Structures are given as C-alpha cells and as structure tokens.
Regions:
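Phosphate/NTP-binding elements of NTP-utilizing enzymes
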Residues: 1-22
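Intein-associated homing endonuclease modules of the LAGLIDADG/DOD-type, together
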Residues: 28, 38, 43-53, 58-290, ...
Length: 307
C-alpha cells in the first residue's frame, strides 16, 4: 500500500450505505455494458452494485483534490482511492466469527498486518448479472477456438483427441457448417452456405465482426460482448476455454488455463471473477528451439464456475 505521488480530482458516487467515499475520476466503474470512467457517471446511470446486481446512481458528489492510495490484493488486482474510502472487510478475528465491519482505508493502513499476517480481507466478487446478449457464435465454441483453435487463415480449425468435444462442437455450429477431419487430431470447420471464390461463411464473418479473424495465438482476446454476456453464456465460454487449454492441478483444488496471449489470460481471469471465483495470472518464460518465448499461465483457484 503506497501513496500515489500525484493528487487527483476525486468523486463520490452515492450507492448503498457503507460503500464508497472517493475514487479518482479515471477509476473504472462496472456497468451492465462494461467499464466506464468514474468521471463520466451521471445521476440515473446504471452500474453494477456490490451484490452483483444492477443499481441506479442516486447522486454524484465531487470531492475535490485528495491524496490517493493504491491497494494491491493477493490476486494481483489493484485499485486506487482516498483514505476516506469505506470497505466492507473481515479482520483475523472476524474471519473466525463470520462477522463483517465497515472501515475506512486510513484505519486499515495503520494496522493492515498483525503477527506477520494480513489483517484484512474482502469477499470474492459475487456473481455478476449482466444482461442477456445476442451472440452469433455459441460461447462454448468461441471459448474452444480461443484456446485450441486456429482462425488465422481462411481455414478455421481446432485440435482435440476427445471425440466428445468434436460431437459437441458439431451440435453448436452455425447453420450450414460441418466438421471435417483433416488429420488424427486436427479438424476443420467448413461452410456449406454458398460457393465461389471469395465466399465467406457465417462463422468467419462473425469472427471478423468480433475482430478475431486473422489473429495469431499471441493476440487472442475475449470480445466485450462475451465478457459482459449473461451468466450461463459466460459459464459456457469458460467451459470451452478450459476444455481446450485447461488442466486440473495435481492437488485437485484448482484449474489452470494456459495461453501465450497476456490479454486472453487477463480476460479469462475477468470471466472467473465475474462468476464469483478467484483467479490469479502468473507468467513464466520457457525456451523452445533455442528461441525464448514468454507464456502466460492463468491459475483459477476454487472457482466452482462450471458446476
């Protein structure tokens, strides 16, 4: 926890009692359609409240210039606020009794460690209820293609040794598409809708509209439409991701998703958080054929999101 060198204009957004106080104008506020800057919030706007539901902004109160602190949580996430910002927390004693308390940041800074342990903790984010959106590609299929699929060239394909996954993908393909086996574990998704040179199938057009078609593994990401989709769609998306590039840790308490794309790893962590789970992103460098590549590892711990 450290004070940011600069002093920023801050604002208070009126929400339920015991929350908020002051955050920088550039702070991100989650809305049903994604994040916006705190400074753009107006009375009547809809935001995601602390319980994961949609709430209406009742008031916006500029706080002037204040010292701003940066708080880092154990999963690596960070936020900035004034020392008057109120937090719903549990202390070491509270965690034993199940009680909660509301304290300002100034109080936490003075005793945030006790007996070499972190004194304060906050709950995981509850399941966030974004509005339902019309998705052109089934979220499981998109998740699988983002993990172990290829759409860099005109041939859209994926790899798997699991015939059950192949059968599932066949059932959720867009109309007039089929799965063609190219090699032992390699499959291609073929469009039968139209013919002729330059013809594009629905799946390719959808990937182009999402800004994904033509991307290499290093540049993959989850489009906002899917990041902020309804609960069931996000679960299906996560299932596709984990079925492709996921694995279960040896102790059975966590799942691990592996990607060379830092943006995709960060997006997967956001999906897990939005489902009420815990996720942390760790990086590790590995050497392949004398060329050093950086791979990003995402550890998803005790998320319970696909149940």
């Amino acid at each position: 926890q450290g004070t940011i060198d600069d002093i920023y204009d801050t604002v208070c957004v009126s929400m339920p009692p015991g929350t908020g106080k002051a955050q920088p104008l550039y702070s991100k506020v989650l809305t049903p359609d994604g994040f916006v800057e705190m400074g753009s919030i107006k009375v009547g706007d809809k935001v995601i409240s602390g319980n994961g539901n949609v709430a209406k902004v009742l008031g916006v109160y500029p706080q002037g210039e204040k010292d701003i602190y940066e708080i880092t949580l154990d999963d690596g996430s960070k936020c900035r606020c004034s020392d008057e910002h109120l937090w719903k927390v549990q202390t070491i004693e509270d965690r034993k009794s199940g009680k909660y308390r509301i304290v300002d940041l100034k109080s936490m800074v003075n005793n945030y460690r006790r007996n070499l342990q972190s004194n304060y903790s906050i709950d995981y984010i509850p399941k966030i209820n974004f509005s339902e959106k019309k998705l052109e590609i089934h979220p499981y299929l998109l998740g699988y293609l983002l993990g172990d699929g290829c759409f860099k060239t005109k041939n859209i394909g994926f790899a798997t040794a699991d015939i059950e996954i192949v059968e599932k993908i066949k059932k959720i393909l867009p109309d007039n598409h089929e799965v063609v086996k190219d090699a032992k574990y390699n499959y291609r998704i073929k469009s039968n809708n139209g013919s002729g040179r330059g013809h594009k199938g629905i799946l390719r057009l959808s990937l182009e509209n999402l800004g994904l078609f033509g991307l290499s593994s290093h540049n993959k990401f989850i489009p906002d439409m899917y990041l902020y989709s309804d609960h069931e769609s996000r679960i299906e998306l996560l299932r596709g991701l984990l079925d492709s590039d996921g694995s279960v840790c040896s102790n059975g308490t966590a799942a691990e998703f592996t990607s060379i794309s830092k943006k995709l790893a960060s997006d997967v962590a956001d999906i897990v958080h939005s489902l009420g789970g815990y996720a942390s992103v760790n990086t590790k460098k590995i050497s392949r054929r004398e060329k050093e590549n950086e791979k990003t590892y995402l550890n998803v711990k005790n998320y319970g999101a696909t149940r």
